[in-house]
Each structure stands twice: as structure tokens, then as C-alpha cells.
């Protein structure tokens, strides 16, 4: 009755409302004179009461269950699900935990889940190396060098990807395909490897040269920086001397012999690069780089691209988006524009409408269109600078300046009739409007103007949209750098081009189709800081 009374919302003196409704008046009066609880309820409440009374007391606490009382098999499963960095603290709790943490099953799972090691680790038993040794002395110790890096090789730069490969940590140098085959896959060669073949410590081996692995050294200088050193550079030498080394390097780097290269200036550039890069003997300093963060409203997915750069061959460029602009930063470079510099910048506010196919062949017509847009951009910048100067005096101390990644809003451009032009809205609006014909399968025909040189004549003949941009040019040794106008042409999700107006040259870029682990920036601010750092090294 007491339970029923609580459910019905009445006190114990009133009785059960549902039971009263079922009974007549006489039965109800009799029921009101009876106790509110039946014998069974009295027994339950009496057993829970203190001193045998009807007043209910606190329930006794449930019996405690210690982790120490769990079977070892269950403890192994629990410990194996924890991050490996937490397990040393767990081993200090008691002797039983420390003994269980010697179970290789735990460390085998941590190697697989944290570092992707899918090898059959049981074969390590032959060498006497445990999975715990692999985790602690190899994977965890060198975890800070996993990811993408740029070597400090003067203006040339490079792209190093350090990965866990089976029971090894290997540093792969990624190389562009041979010029001018920009759509071919990337090439790569190992520069060093780290493995654990004995229980004492991990072994670092230099892989440079053609005589197999030999002794090397790795030093983690500071956060996001490490260096490699070869202790047996004689393994890099070839029996035929420098001439044989140069011929071998040329065949690997360019896929041809010096006799195949008829351009004298190109021969000089190739020889200069060989002399400069070979002097390092794989003793290099690397700085971490991140892949650019992406947003749903980006023009295309940002990332790494291979691009044609005339006599310098193919180079690696990172495309990233920064508000109303897109930037192409060199990961590899040359004596004119070194690695780390911003090779192209695209103004997503200023679309360029190409003329019909016949007029596209006329370089003067394309030049006229681009220069008109450049003049419009200059006027907007002057107006924006004047407005910024007037507003600077009124700016309060709490008002923040826009960051480099979020440029100040510029005045919308005007069309010939005084109405806002198609390049005056938000970048997302311009991109959406430009993508409409492309999504309907109505991509605009495209052809290079007569007189514009291209290393690759097999460029797409249909484009989605074009934007005004600038390209960085300079003399040898990065002297007298200046930004010159050009046209950014978006072909598809994986290819774009840039017409260098002043050079009368065309660069074609194709996406690097590779998956990189441990390469995402922890934040957009960290990515912007990384760009500043690699640019400052060659400025």
C-alpha cells in the first residue's frame, strides 16, 4: 500500500486513491480504519529500518571491489586500452600491476593503435626484443620526428616524410616526377632509418649513397626541429669519382643524361644544384611543416602540388587559403625563388572573365584584361588605405586589428555601369557563382596565348574559373624580388595553372596524391606561424 500511495501521490493517512475509486462507501470507510501497509511491506521496511522500527534508514553500502581482485586476464584487457604514456605510472601502483604490465599483449596493442604497426610482432621473439621494447625504445622515443619536414638545403629545400614502416622508422625524401611530367606520381628515396635489433637501444642508419645502410646519428635539437648526421660518409663515394656520382645523380634527379639537355643555362643550373646539395652528405637540419587546414568554403581542397618552373624543372608548392586570398608557398625552390617563399598569390575577390577562344590566343588581349584588373586593385588598395588612415584615429583601445590570415574588407569594385562588379562580393559568393557553369558541365574552353611558353603542352583545354593573381620573380640569388601580375586558372579539383604575364610563361600544377600521417596543424595559428618561419629562413 505504501508503494502504491507514493505512486498515486497521496499521503499514508488518505489511502490509495485507485483502491478507493473501485470500492463503495462502506468499503472505503473500512479501509481508512486499516493500517496503510500490508504485512509484506511491513517486513521489507522493517528489515531496512534501524532497530526494527518502521522508520527507514540508509541502505548499507555495496561491497567494495578492488582492481586487485579482478582476474589477470581482465586487467590485461583494461591496461591494453589505456594510452601507453599512462602505463608507467600504473606500474608504480603495486607489484601486481607491474608484473601484469610485462605482458606483451598490452604493448602489441599499443603499437598497433597508436603507431599503426600491423606487423606480426611475434617474430621479435627470435631476436629477444619484446613489444614493450619496440614501444618504449623506438616508437615512443622517436615519436617527435614523425610527420612532414623541410630540410635546410639553402634555396632548394625539400620534403621529408618520417613514418613508421613495419618495425622501422624511415625518413623518405619525396621528389617530384621527372620534368615535365607533372601528373606522374611522386618519387621517394630513403635517407635514414631507425630500428631495434637489440634490447639496449635503437639503431640509426644512414641510407644515403649506393653502398647500403651504414652508421648514422639523429639529434632532436628542439621542438619541431631535428638533425641527422652520417658517421661514414665514405659510403657515399663512388669508385668512378665525382663524374660518376654526378651522372648517377642526374639520372635519378632528371631522368636523363647531360647530353640530353641542350639548353646551356639549364645545364648550369643542374650542375650548380648537384655541387650545392652533395656537399651536405646527408648531414641536415629539418624543420617541421604542416599541411594547410581546410574549410568547406575553400575554392578547392588545399594541399601539396607539383608545378612546372621552366629551366628549374618541377617543384613542390603548398596551396593554402587565407580569407579572400589563396597562396602558393614553395616547399622546394631554386636560386631565383628559394624554398619557403610565396610564389603565387590569388585574389579571390577579382575574377577574370576570359574572352572567346579565338581572342584567348591573342596575348595582348589577355594582357589588357589583366592589367585593367590590376589597376582596379590598386585603386581599391589606395581607397582602403585612405579609409584605414581616417579610421585609425577613431579606433578604440579594445578594437583589434585584423590578422594576416583575415585581411581587411576591401571596397567592392564597380562595373562599367556603376553597379557592383562580379568581383566585389564575398569570396564564397564569387566561387559559388563561378562554379555554377562548371557543375552543369559547361566548363569554359581554354587555350594559352600564342607566345606563352609551357613546359607541358598537355595542359587541360577546359577550365572552371580564373582569378587575378600575382607571381614572385627575382634575379639569381633572390635579388630584386617583385610581384608581377598574372592569371590563376582553376582546371579541376586537382589541377590549376598560372600565366606569368611578364615572363610570358605558364606553370601547370598537379596535386600530390599521397596520404601523410602526423602532418595536420594543431591550429590555424600554428600553420600561419609555420609559414612565417620557413619564409624568414630565406628572406
Swiss-Prot record:
Keywords, sorted A to Z: Cell cycle, Cytoplasm, Cytoskeleton, Disease variant, DNA damage, Intellectual disability, Phosphoprotein, Ubl conjugation, Ubl conjugation pathway
Localisation per UniProt entry: Cytoplasm; Cytoplasm, Cytoskeleton, Microtubule organizing center, Centrosome
Inducing or repressing factors: By DNA damage. Increases after UV irradiation, X-ray irradiation, oxidative stress (H(2)O(2)) or addition of the chemotherapeutic DNA-damaging agents etoposide, adriamycin, cisplatin or fluorouracil.
GO annotation terms (biological process): anaphase-promoting complex-dependent catabolic process; cellular response to oxidative stress; DNA damage response; mitotic G1 DNA damage checkpoint signaling; proteasome-mediated ubiquitin-dependent protein catabolic process; protein ubiquitination; SCF-dependent proteasomal ubiquitin-dependent protein catabolic process
Mutagenesis / variant outcome for changing residue 236 to A: Impaired folding, inducing the formation of insoluble aggregates
Effect annotated for changing residue 334 to N: Found in patients with an autosomal dominant neurodevelopmental disorder characterized by developmental delay, hypotonia, intellectual disability, poor speech and spastic cerebral palsy; likely pathogenic; redirects the substrate specificity toward non-amidated new substrates, leading to their degradation
Pfam families recorded: Cyclin_D1_bind (PF12014), F-box-like (PF12937)
Residue span of motif D box: 64-69
Motif window: DDL motif: 297-299
One Gene Ontology term, aspect cellular component: cytoplasm
Phenotypic consequence of residue 230 to A: Impaired folding, inducing the formation of insoluble aggregates
Gene3D superfamilies (alphabetical): 1.20.1280.50
Effect of residue 480 to A: Decreased phosphorylation, leading to impair ubiquitination by the SCF(FBXO46) complex
The record's account of how the chain is modified after translation: Phosphorylation at Ser-278 by ATM following gamma-irradiation results in its stabilization. Phosphorylation at Thr-419 and Ser-480 in absence of stress promotes its ubiquitination and degradation by the SCF(FBXO46) complex. Phosphorylation at Ser-33 by AKT1 promotes association with CDC20 and ubiquitination by the APC/C complex.
GO molecular function: cyclin binding; ubiquitin-like ligase-substrate adaptor activity
Region (Disordered): 11-53, 377-446
Result of altering residue 214 to A/F/N: Impaired folding, inducing the formation of insoluble aggregates
Modification Phosphoserine, positions: 33, 278, 480
Record remark on domains: Zinc-binding is required for the structure of the protein and facilitate folding. The destruction box (D box) acts as a recognition signal for CDC20 for degradation by the APC/C complex.
PANTHER family for the chain: F-BOX FAMILY PROTEIN, F-BOX ONLY PROTEIN 31
Disorder named in the UniProt entry: Intellectual developmental disorder, autosomal recessive 45: A disorder characterized by significantly below average general intellectual functioning associated with impairments in adaptive behavior and manifested during the developmental period. MRT45 manifestations include mild to moderate intellectual disability and dysmorphic features, including coarse facies, broad nasal bridge, fleshy nares, and thick, prominent lips.
Function: Substrate-recognition component of the SCF(FBXO31) protein ligase complex, which specifically mediates the ubiquitination of proteins amidated at their C-terminus in response to oxidative stress, leading to their degradation by the proteasome. FBXO31 specifically recognizes and binds C-terminal peptides bearing an amide: C-terminal amidation in response to oxidative stress takes place following protein fragmentation.
Name the UniProt record assigns to this protein: F-box only protein 31
The species this protein was found in: Homo sapiens
Amino acid at each position: 500500500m505504501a508503494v502504491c500511495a507514493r505512486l498515486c501521490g497521496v499521503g499514508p493517512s488518505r489511502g490509495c486513491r485507485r483502491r478507493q475509486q473501485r470500492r463503495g462507501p462502506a468499503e472505503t470507510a473500512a479501509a481508512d480504519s486499516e493500517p496503510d501497509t500490508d504485512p509484506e511491506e511491513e517486513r521489507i521496511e522493517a528489515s531496512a529500518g534501524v532497530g526494527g522500527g518502521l522508520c527507514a534508514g540508509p541502505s548499507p553500502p555495496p561491497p567494495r571491489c578492488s582492481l586487485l581482485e579482478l582476474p589477470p586476464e581482465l586487467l590485461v584487457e583494461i591496461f591494453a586500452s589505456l594510452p601507453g604514456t599512462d602505463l608507467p605510472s600504473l606500474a608504480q601502483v603495486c607489484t601486481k600491476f607491474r608484473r601484469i604490465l610485462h605482458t606483451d599483449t598490452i604493448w602489441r596493442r599499443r603499437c598497433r593503435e597508436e603507431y599503426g604497426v600491423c606487423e606480426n610482432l611475434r617474430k621479435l621473439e627470435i631476436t629477444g626484443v619484446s613489444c614493450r621494447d619496440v614501444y618504449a625504445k623506438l616508437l615512443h622515443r622517436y615519436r617527435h620526428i614523425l610527420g612532414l619536414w623541410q630540410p635546410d638545403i639553402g634555396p632548394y629545400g625539400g620534403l621529408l616524410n618520417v613514418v613508421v614502416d613495419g618495425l622501422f622508422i624511415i625518413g623518405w625524401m619525396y621528389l617530384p616526377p621527372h620534368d615535365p611530367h607533372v601528373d606522374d606520381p611522386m618519387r621517394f628515396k630513403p635517407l635514414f632509418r631507425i630500428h631495434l635489433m637489440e634490447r639496449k637501444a635503437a639503431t640509426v642508419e644512414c641510407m644515403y649513397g649506393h653502398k647500403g645502410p651504414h652508421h648514422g646519428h639523429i639529434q632532436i635539437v628542439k621542438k619541431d626541429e631535428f638533425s641527422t648526421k652520417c658517421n661514414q660518409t665514405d659510403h657515399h663515394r663512388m669508385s668512378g669519382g665525382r663524374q660518376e656520382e654526378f651522372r648517377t645523380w642526374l639520372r635519378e634527379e632528371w631522368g636523363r643524361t647531360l647530353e640530353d639537355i641542350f639548353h646551356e643555362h639549364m645545364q648550369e643550373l643542374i650542375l650548380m644544384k648537384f655541387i650545392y646539395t652533395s656537399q651536405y652528405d646527408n648531414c641536415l637540419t629539418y624543420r617541421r611543416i604542416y599541411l594547410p587546414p581546410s574549410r568547406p568554403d575553400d575554392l578547392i581542397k588545399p594541399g601539396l602540388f607539383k608545378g612546372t618552373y621552366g629551366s628549374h624543372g618541377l617543384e613542390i608548392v603548398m596551396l593554402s587559403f587565407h580569407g579572400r586570398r589563396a597562396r602558393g608557398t614553395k616547399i622546394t625552390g631554386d636560386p631565383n625563388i628559394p624554398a619557403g617563399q610565396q610564389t603565387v598569390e590569388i585574389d579571390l575577390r577579382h575574377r577574370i572573365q576570359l574572352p572567346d577562344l579565338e581572342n584567348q590566343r591573342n596575348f595582348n588581349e589577355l594582357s589588357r584584361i589583366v592589367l585593367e584588373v590590376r589597376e582596379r586593385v590598386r585603386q581599391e588598395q589606395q581607397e582602403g588605405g585612405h579609409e584605414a588612415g581616417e579610421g585609425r584615429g577613431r579606433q578604440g583601445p579594445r578594437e583589434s586589428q585584423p590578422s594576416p590570415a583575415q585581411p581587411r574588407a576591401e571596397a567592392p569594385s564597380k562595373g562599367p555601369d556603376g553597379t557592383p562588379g562580379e568581383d566585389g562580393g564575398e569570396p564564397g559568393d564569387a566561387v559559388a557563382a563561378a562554379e555554377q557553369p562548371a557543375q552543369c558541365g559547361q566548363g569554359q574552353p581554354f587555350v594559352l596565348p600564342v607566345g606563352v611558353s609551357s613546359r607541358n603542352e598537355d595542359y587541360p583545354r577546359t577550365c572552371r574559373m580564373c582569378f587575378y593573381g600575382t607571381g614572385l620573380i627575382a634575379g639569381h640569388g633572390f635579388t630584386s624580388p617583385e610581384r608581377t601580375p598574372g592569371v590563376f586558372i582553376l582546371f579541376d579539383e586537382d589541377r590549376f595553372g598560372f600565366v606569368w604575364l611578364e615572363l610570358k610563361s605558364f606553370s601547370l600544377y598537379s596535386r600530390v596524391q599521397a596520404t601523410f600521417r602526423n602532418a595536420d596543424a594543431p591550429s590555424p595559428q600554428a600553420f600561419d606561424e609555420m609559414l612565417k618561419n620557413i619564409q624568414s629562413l630565406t628572406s
